[in-house]
Amino acid sequence: MLTDRQLLILRAIVDDYIKTAQPVGSRTLSKRSDVTFSSATIRNEMADLEEMGLIEKPHTSAGRIPSELGYRFYVDHLIRPESISPQEAKALKSLFAHSVNENDRLIRHTADLLSELTHYTTLVLGPKEEGQRLHHLELIPLAEGRVVIVLVTETGHVEHKTLQLAEALSREAASRLMERLNQTLRGTPLRQLRLRLLEEIRRFRSEHSEQTTLLSKALDIVLTDQHEERPLIYLGGKANMFDQPEFQDVAKLRPVLELIEQQEALFDFLSPSLDNQILITIGSENNVDALKDCSVIRAHYSVDGVSLGTLALIGPKRMDYNRGINSIIHLLQAFQTELRKNSLD
């Protein structure tokens, strides 16, 4: 159990190190207005904190820096909630002032804004479409037998593909087919949609001859492609990595960049859980070797209780946890509101 004095000194060390990236000594701490005891007392308390494994001494400095255990204690017990600045609140309001009814664009905007607010790299795992439901299908005939097929989910995600049919399809025929299909299939989970859709088209086939047969094949292709896609990972602020003193060492930065570029290894790491609370993992807690020098703040987003994806910040272990957590909390609320609007449109 730490004393009040030790708690104050540990918080001061972490706060100073986050701001300066320089080891913190007793002389530096003694100049702080909230530290009112002598340098000798500070040194004794720092020695105790080091013995507890909460701070450590870098090889090249007389000062101390937080250990992973120290950061964990700080995150769990010492963070003080802060509001975002008026300028940041204005930026959030501006981003969502005009409704963005395509989730892809909305997610990209969100990733970019979160990286601007925090100056860290942002990853957003997009919705896993197989867990969603159909809102409606659209069939738009074009010239020379071409047709655009559009699939819209209840969360506003849009998939579309242009296909070539052997015969031109009239707008009247397309409208009748889509009206019937949407009446029957609205709300169907995407993982069940392909079979349900083909069953409906078979029932409808006698009314539309060859065109419906071709259309069933086209829809089958669209839904098969869509169903097999993995969720997209949206990236914001990749260049922010280069601004961190820790990552001036290319050997530390390279594996992080390679992990982000590959993306495949990130799916399990970012996949939503049933717990919608913010999750903070520090260094070795990430269980991904490339992130051993990083901290990650994750929050899962949802619409009407359905978990859809993940917002994540990646930075050094020395990241500003207060700023990261508060930025995610405020952005998450606005982001989920826009997703919910899209699901109702």
Swiss-Prot record:
Keywords: Repressor, Stress response, Transcription, Transcription regulation. One of its GO terms (biological process) is negative regulation of DNA-templated transcription. InterPro entries: GAF-like_dom_sf (IPR029016), HrcA (IPR002571), HrcA_C (IPR021153), WH-like_DNA-bd_sf (IPR036388), WH_DNA-bd_sf (IPR036390), WHTH_transcript_rep_HrcA_IDD (IPR023120). Signal peptide: none annotated. GO terms for molecular function: DNA binding. Transmembrane segments: none annotated. It holds the Pfam family HrcA. HAMAP family: HrcA (MF_00081). Negative regulator of class I heat shock genes (grpE-dnaK-dnaJ and groELS operons). Prevents heat-shock induction of these operons. Belongs to the HrcA family. PANTHER family: HEAT-INDUCIBLE TRANSCRIPTION REPRESSOR HRCA. This is Heat-inducible transcription repressor HrcA. It comes from Exiguobacterium sibiricum (strain DSM 17290 / CCUG 55495 / CIP 109462 / JCM 13490 / 255-15). The gene is hrcA.
